[in-house]
Amino acid sequence: MTIPFILASASPARRKLLQTMGIDPIVRHSNFDESQIQLTDTIALVQTLAQCKAEVVANEVNEGLILGCDSLLEVDTQSYGKPESPEEAIIRWQKMRGNSGVLYTGHALIDKTQNKQLLRCGITQVYFADVSDAEIKAYVASGEPLKCAGCFALEGKGGLFVEKLEGCHSNVIGLSLPLLREMLNELGYTVMDFWQ
């Protein structure tokens, strides 16, 4: 029997990461209102948001593994999701350039068959290049940073402005593949169980 693998996210980057590792997930966007959750601890916040997204979708299906994720970038003790405007993105990039931040991705994996749930957080240190005002304006004008937690896409144009990472590369894109493998193993599965 094949167990459905359901991604509780509309993120094309997360879907692509799963497909790269051989899993072609069923995509179900949770439409969860993130403003309902007000926590100051970044790890608790991303894990709670990931859990809420996964639970919304889990309540809509009868079987399968449901993966919810949420990412935030913390720079100088301030947590950032997606910027709300180009102006906000420019201000953020002015703070980020030549600086470093920590990208947190909460992972919630619900196994409907076993009635089990796991919560984890991937943590990656990101070092940003000292980019010019012109580079910031051009990058923001591309529209890419407005779609991403932390205001950059490592797998896109934003990768040009990241000097180095300490930790999991895929975590910065929105899903830690090594962490997911560990979570699957903890539930008694292997990644190969979900290969297409």
Curated annotation (Swiss-Prot):
It is found in: Cytoplasm. Pfam families: Maf (PF02545). Disulfide bonds: none annotated. One of its GO terms (cellular component) is cytoplasm. The keyword Lipid metabolism does not apply. Coiled coil: none annotated. It comes from the Bacteria. The keyword Nucleotidyltransferase does not apply. The active site is at D70. Keywords: Cytoplasm, Hydrolase, Nucleotide metabolism. One of its GO terms (biological process) is nucleotide metabolic process. Its cofactor is a divalent metal cation. One of its GO terms (molecular function) is nucleoside triphosphate diphosphatase activity. It is an enzyme of class 3 (hydrolase). It catalyses: a ribonucleoside 5'-triphosphate + H2O = a ribonucleoside 5'-phosphate + diphosphate + H(+); a 2'-deoxyribonucleoside 5'-triphosphate + H2O = a 2'-deoxyribonucleoside 5'-phosphate + diphosphate + H(+). Its EC number is 3.6.1.9. Nucleoside triphosphate pyrophosphatase. May have a dual role in cell division arrest and in preventing the incorporation of modified nucleotides into cellular nucleic acids. Belongs to the Maf family. This is Nucleoside triphosphate pyrophosphatase.
